[in-house]
Amino acid sequence: MAAVNTVSSLPCSKAGAAVAGGAPRPSTCSVFYPPRCWSKRSSGNGVRAQASTTETTAAPAAEVTTKVEKVSKKQVDGVVTNKYRPKEPYTGRCLLNTRITGDDAPGETWHMVFSTDGEIPYREGQSIGVIPDGIDKNGKPHKLRLYSIASSAIGDFADSKTVSLCVKRLVYTNDKGEIVKGVCSNFLCDLKPGSDVKITGPVGKEMLMPKDPNATIIMLGTGTGIAPFRSFLWKMFFEEHDDYRFNGLAWLFLGVPTSSTLLYREEFERMKEIAPERFRLDFAVSREQTNAAGEKMYIQTRMAEYKDELWELLKKDNTYVYMCGLKGMEKGIDDIMIDLAAKDGIDWLDYKKQLKKSEQWNVEVY
């Protein structure tokens, strides 16, 4: 069973699912997690000694090698992928679609909730595909676009029957001076409650949460890259589960251009009130903030203020880093870590490979 301690401040079209002003209203629902079952498999049943037809001494027995199946540190048990595919998508219904960026924000970002009736058994950190209505310039149906899920596994309404997305409307001017609109993002941002939407998935295991409830989880996000981290944090701080209680440290770094693009800010500040010792929150607002040297405050600039502390955390085997958002953020973060690791005589790029191998460095960028 999972109980929701608080609710989002977002508007909600479902009666009883949320309370205006963010006042908490407990709600319960069943959450099933299959038993954790891992096995070891042998590569063979053994080797018999072979005797030569001309010699009486037996050849030495060959060593028996046993292949041990790797046990993941993440919550992979029972994870479902690709239940719905492009040829046979699930048809959900839009329940809510609301803009969550200010009027002066550089672009629009929308939070939307779709019905699933429990038919899309996703986990925090997974994605779904959306197939927009209509046809392309060649007369063929539009291809699906993948979006990180922005809700916990039980959904914004705590009934395990919805899935939420965080989508930025893509509009830009190409080299010819023509205004181009992203097909799927505009389709989604224009959806009205009651409209149908074709959904595929769920997909992905890269961004699944760690099993260890005492882990340190460092989340690095830019823009709509906040989506999977909202799903993590709702599970950690807004819900109660019989089989999961987060007692570790969650540290979120969120990079955005302006204050009006700080997505879900009220939710995150409420989490800090609930668990001030277990949740740290740092914003990097590039067009409004600078560091001591007068440089623009990008996510890597903010991280540099805590570089020694971050490096010490990264030396521990229960620290997990998750990065989601614009691909350009990777280099800036690597630059910081290269210098830090070098002080200890460590090659950062090699060390990062080890972290990836142990599932402690997880990246989803675009």
Curated annotation (Swiss-Prot):
GO terms for molecular function: ferredoxin-NADP+ reductase activity. Transmembrane segments: none annotated. Residues 87-209 form the FAD-binding FR-type domain. FAD binds at residues 145-148, 166-168, 172, 183-185, 224. Heterodimer with LFNR1. Component of high molecular weight thylakoid LFNRs-containing protein complexes containing LIR1, LFNR1, LFNR2, TIC62 and TROL proteins. Interacts directly with LFNR1 and LFNR2; LIR1 increases the affinity of LFNR1 and LFNR2 for TIC62 and subsequent thylakoid relocalization. This is Ferredoxin--NADP reductase, leaf isozyme 2, chloroplastic. The modification Phosphothreonine is found at residue 216. One of its GO terms (biological process) is photosynthesis. It is an enzyme of class 1 (oxidoreductase). The lineage of its organism: Eukaryota, Viridiplantae, Streptophyta, Embryophyta, Tracheophyta. Pathway: Energy metabolism; photosynthesis. It is a peripheral membrane protein. It is found in: Plastid, Chloroplast stroma; Plastid, Chloroplast thylakoid membrane. May form interchain disulfide bonds with LIR1. Plays a key role in regulating the relative amounts of cyclic and non-cyclic electron flow to meet the demands of the plant for ATP and reducing power. One of its GO terms (cellular component) is chloroplast stroma. Keywords: Chloroplast, Disulfide bond, Electron transport, FAD, Flavoprotein, Membrane, NADP, Oxidoreductase, Phosphoprotein, Photosynthesis, Plastid, Thylakoid, Transit peptide, Transport.
